[in-house]
Amino acid sequence: MAKIIAFDEEARRGLERGLNILADAVRVTLGPRGRNVVLEKKWGAPTITNDGVSIAKEIELDDPFEKIGAELVKEVAKKTDDVAGDGTTTATVLAQALVREGLRNVAAGADPISLKRGIEKAVAAVTEELKAAAKEIETKEEIAATASISAGDSTIGAIIAEAIDKVGKEGVVTVEESNTFGTELELTEGMRFDKGYLSQYFVTDPERQEAVFEDAYILIVNSKISNIKDLLPIVDKVIQSGKQLLIIAEDVDGEALATLVVNKIRGIFKSVAVKAPGFGDRRKAQLQDIAILTGGQVIAEEVGLKLENVTLDLLGTARKVVITKDETTIVEGGGDATEIAARVQQIRNEIGNTDSDYDREKLQERLAKLAGGVAVIKAGAATEVELKERKHRIEDAVRNAKAAVEEGIVAGGGVALIQAGKLAFEKLQLEGDEATGANIVRVAVDAPLKQIALNAGLEPGVVAERVRNLPSGHGLNAATGEYVDMLAAGINDPVKVTRSALLNAASIAGLFLTTEAVVADKPEKNPAPAGDPTGGMDF
């Protein structure tokens, strides 16, 4: 396919146009008075959201250079969302500000490499100040305040705080759709591990890219499965029972995997295969944990069990299993409560006996998965459109709250960035274009607060200047228009969110500034429509 190439200023400006189109659509959602964006869907009702990454994903541009610029910023939003669960809009606004200021300096003759180095040093300094200002979360009320800001709803915040309080920070919190109007919390025993499906063809919910089974059998094998002949006897028994099957094994490949996939596609038999978590002895221990939780047995030749001789009573069971590309969650395993309690006590004893910090950490992870359980938040709404939007908000708020528990919180509303920036730049000693690069960050850290003020109908420059000179932790409550102690007022952000947003935005900005050429696919011209054989006459 033919390519088109742009150089120098033309290349950078093309990328910037794409960035600006995307950022302008996303930034209107920032803050308590941010607006929503309506996303058209090819099928079904449109989605109404104020989530930066959801909006960014939907934007596709015609111009090839603008498209590349937009894709780079999508990466900022997606990476921030993956790491912290929130801060996507903040990251996009920061990226736009960094690129705008940076390109202005490049056009004025500054050295892009030195600018990038200056940006990186300034961002590192601001990040250190953010960490130093962090306040650890200790109470349920503080978790609720953080989750409430992300969800934009204090009721949801309280439910999330209750969920995290019950299952602990190591526990699992999932969100499901409810048939009722309200939002309620259900606590269920369960386990999650970091291995997903081995083939995308196992997916049962294409929109969420998940395989979800109710009342499923679980086959746990401590070896590799390649030969379908070994697997067929137990698969036949499961088909006759009318249930679905989750296979957890060292690996499933070759004709065994191919046969399972073909049967799923043809609708003959629903199954999903995942790799067992961990390695070596740790894998054996985790498989035994899963077996005890689900009431099954680990199929291993060392204990005299062969795959071809497996019967249904050796399989585990669970009320529900949810498998994504990265994770498997087992909810309400059919194991015996006494055996589970004994296993939990055994792991606690091992934690007490080990001298290795690494082993202790891994044992605590296993304990959390066995004993912590799963909290399920059931979201309800009047319409399907509202339900999707509400569910998405709750999922973001859960990850936001977990990030807060992990690294602590700082003043929200863009205040922490401005005030951390002020302290960082007083200490930075840079020269030449590196100092110019640091100054780009100095200007950019104001951008989130300015956008929040703009969305609230206030004068951005005046607000930013006033907040910069307020005591540490004090800033604008955009919901009321008052200047308050942000943490005392319950307006906070997890450090992880703010830090990730700044780091990811700076990373992309550095790429923009040091770009000297862009190579893109030449857009294909659509063929002219065929002529009307009737000559346009109405026969």
Swiss-Prot record:
<feature type="binding site">
    <location>
        <position position="413"/>
    </location>
    <ligand>
        <name>ATP</name>
    </ligand>
</feature>
<dbReference type="GO" id="GO:0005737">
    <property type="term" value="C:cytoplasm"/>
</dbReference>
<dbReference type="InterPro" id="IPR027409">
    <property type="entry name" value="GroEL-like_apical_dom_sf"/>
</dbReference>
<dbReference type="InterPro" id="IPR027413">
    <property type="entry name" value="GROEL-like_equatorial_sf"/>
</dbReference>
<keyword id="KW-0067">ATP-binding</keyword>
<dbReference type="InterPro" id="IPR027410">
    <property type="entry name" value="TCP-1-like_intermed_sf"/>
</dbReference>
<keyword id="KW-0413">Isomerase</keyword>
<keyword id="KW-0547">Nucleotide-binding</keyword>
<feature type="binding site">
    <location>
        <begin position="29"/>
        <end position="32"/>
    </location>
    <ligand>
        <name>ATP</name>
    </ligand>
</feature>
<feature type="binding site">
    <location>
        <position position="493"/>
    </location>
    <ligand>
        <name>ATP</name>
    </ligand>
</feature>
<feature type="binding site">
    <location>
        <begin position="86"/>
        <end position="90"/>
    </location>
    <ligand>
        <name>ATP</name>
    </ligand>
</feature>
<dbReference type="InterPro" id="IPR002423">
    <property type="entry name" value="Cpn60/GroEL/TCP-1"/>
</dbReference>
<dbReference type="InterPro" id="IPR001844">
    <property type="entry name" value="Cpn60/GroEL"/>
</dbReference>
<feature type="binding site">
    <location>
        <begin position="477"/>
        <end position="479"/>
    </location>
    <ligand>
        <name>ATP</name>
    </ligand>
</feature>
<keyword id="KW-0143">Chaperone</keyword>
<dbReference type="GO" id="GO:0042026">
    <property type="term" value="P:protein refolding"/>
</dbReference>
<dbReference type="GO" id="GO:0005524">
    <property type="term" value="F:ATP binding"/>
</dbReference>
<dbReference type="InterPro" id="IPR018370">
    <property type="entry name" value="Chaperonin_Cpn60_CS"/>
</dbReference>
<comment type="subunit">
    <text>Forms a cylinder of 14 subunits composed of two heptameric rings stacked back-to-back. Interacts with the co-chaperonin GroES.</text>
</comment>
<dbReference type="GO" id="GO:0140662">
    <property type="term" value="F:ATP-dependent protein folding chaperone"/>
</dbReference>
<dbReference type="Pfam" id="PF00118">
    <property type="entry name" value="Cpn60_TCP1"/>
</dbReference>
<dbReference type="GO" id="GO:0016853">
    <property type="term" value="F:isomerase activity"/>
</dbReference>
<dbReference type="GO" id="GO:0051082">
    <property type="term" value="F:unfolded protein binding"/>
</dbReference>
<comment type="function">
    <text>Together with its co-chaperonin GroES, plays an essential role in assisting protein folding. The GroEL-GroES system forms a nano-cage that allows encapsulation of the non-native substrate proteins and provides a physical environment optimized to promote and accelerate protein folding.</text>
</comment>
<comment type="similarity">
    <text>Belongs to the chaperonin (HSP60) family.</text>
</comment>
<keyword id="KW-0963">Cytoplasm</keyword>
<protein>
    <recommendedName>
        <fullName>Chaperonin GroEL</fullName>
        <ecNumber>5.6.1.7</ecNumber>
    </recommendedName>
</protein>
